[in-house]
Amino acid sequence: MKEASNLSDPLFPIQGENMDIQKIGIITSGGDCGGLNAVVKGTSQMATQKQIQTFAIPNGYAGLYNLLDTEDLVELTPRRIDSFSIGLAGSEAGHSRVKISKIKDPNKYQRIKDGLAKFGIDALVISGGDDTGSVVADLDSHGIRCVHAPKTMDLDLMPYSVGGDSTINRIAFFVSELKTTGRTHNRVMIIEVFGRYAGHTAFRGGIAGEADCILIPEIPVDWEEVYRHLKKVYIKRICESDIRAGTYTIVVSEGLKNASGEPIYDESAGVDTFGHKKLAGAGKYVAQEITKKLSADEDIKHFMQQTGMYVEGLYTVPEVRTITPSHLVRAGTTSAYDANFGMAAGANAVNLLLKGLSGITFSGYSGKTVYYMDIHDAIEHRHVDLDEVTLFEQLGFCFGRVRSSYEPDCEIQRGRIKRIY
């Protein structure tokens, strides 16, 4: 693994400002999320400062492939970009889930080059996740200049990616809000969220929303431990309430694995256009496991009777409900952090292009230092640090396993330390 590089890294020699770039196309690809409009606007505003025109290439990679047949493109002039807000999620440029390598056209890269030449576009700023990044590498290898601005709400790339913080905030909001209906009906509430094979958004959103249990792909589930925690917390919460009211919330990442380490799929969901199985059904699976254990537990029958809830044949165990906020966690508003990061990512993608760089991923900045990574390193999957999970286990959160011990090492920091803001 190479370390993130800055603009003085000899791996990518600086050629000085590349002023043969007169027009830049902007593409947003894959799933939408918060922060993308910030990337679009940051790219356009920096390009304007450099006397470069920018154009939105609509519909992601599908639009790039079809440029040759496109009549005109929207130029992102200062007036045009003033018409949309970086505070809104989604992308003014539009998306599609199309991977260039999947297009069955042997002349597809030449077709793309001809389309770019038609509009005089010299380089591309492309914002997306790992699949998008792999296409950036392909385009670069075919002589198309492009820089990758990392975007994925899943946070499974090596650098921070725009969309992650916005999604975490929305998950936290929904988890917290659902407690009102859960408590009213004394329900066990299961919230299934996006994240694919990494549990970052479930982990961080679940903590911020004060979920009781958080199940992520990095930890195969011990159902006995989940049920032990649920039974203890749920019964205690209701019995200590003067009106016998309480709820128990579980946040489930869609890429959850069973005890054998195999992902849980709803096979009827099929595959997406990138060829990935659609991860669905984890929340439903968890609900089934919990319901089976509640139904087989005589203590639960006694608890229901003691608290005045039990009705033979009608209401014998607590209700277990699965909620899937789905695209609501992508939609709506962009967090302040994603708005800041997205603007910087777009602006510095232009700066990287003007330094003669291509086929790389913007990975961050500090003052006047811009960092980037080899794109193949940047799109390697990054998973939840289980040492951080251990910390939150000490605070009472259940992660579907027996709680580990936590003995931290303590070190003093001095000087100007790195922080979010």
Segments and roles (model prediction):
Residues 20-68:
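N-terminal phosphate-binding or glycine-rich loops at protein starts, especially the Walker A/P-loop
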Residues 23-31, 91-96, 122-126, 188-192, ...:
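Short glycine-rich or small-residue beta-strand-to-loop segments that form or flank ligand, phosphate
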Residues 33-43, 64-65, 109-110, 124-137, ...:
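Short glycine/serine/threonine-rich phosphate/pyrophosphate-binding segments
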Residues 54, 123-128, 134-138, 145-146, ...:
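Accessory alpha-helical/coil subdomains and C-terminal extensions
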Residues 67-124, 131, 162-176:
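Glycine-rich oxoanion-binding loops at beta->alpha junctions
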Residues 266-421:
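C-terminal non-catalytic interaction/assembly regions of soluble proteins
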